[in-house]
Amino acid sequence: SLAVACVLALGNISDRMEKGLSQQSREFMAGDRSLQSSRAVPKAWIDEARQRGLKVGEQLTFATMTFARDTPQLANVKAVDDVYPMYGTLQTNPPGLKPQPGSVLLAPRLMALLNLKIGDSIDVGDATLRIAGEVVQEPDSGFNPFQIAPRLMMNMADVEKTAAVQPGSRVTWRYKFGGTPQQLEAYEKWLLPQLKPEQRWYGLEQDEGALGKSLERSQQFLL
């Protein structure tokens, strides 16, 4: 009947929309799930995830002073590994760049504040790194009204050279996980009993930011 056909059609549309939202949520997070911690998690946790077939990426964010020809400027540093971004696109100028060892990507505002151009060098802590380009948009940047300092992106391999991260430093580790729903669910059951109170395992649905709340409302509408 017409009523049955309409219900089936609406169901198909709802399924397609939900799949589209799921794909977008992956890109907004640059992963299917995130693990956030104020310190590096045990290597065994990452090894276990990879043994279960999950793809894992690591990020570290912290604030530190940068210098260009003795001019200081606080920067919000995001160090990433070669997996980044697991999903989504890092928009840069010139296009197609990723943070490579020995080089950095700067937000246009940081470039302007320090009067720098692509190809110049910048001191990040004890390390002198070459500016390969500008960060235009990060897939997982979200919206953080408290992030006052402009972004500087670097490769995880260069963090130790900066000496900016010491015991007691305020840092945030984020581990991004990608895999099938079954792989993620099995790993979650293994991981959750081991988490400390300051550690958080979440998908975009559990994210407290605006994107997470928007996705939750969209899913409720589809249901």
Set out the residue ranges of the language-model regions.
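Membrane transport/envelope proteins' first extracytoplasmic loop
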Residues: 1-223
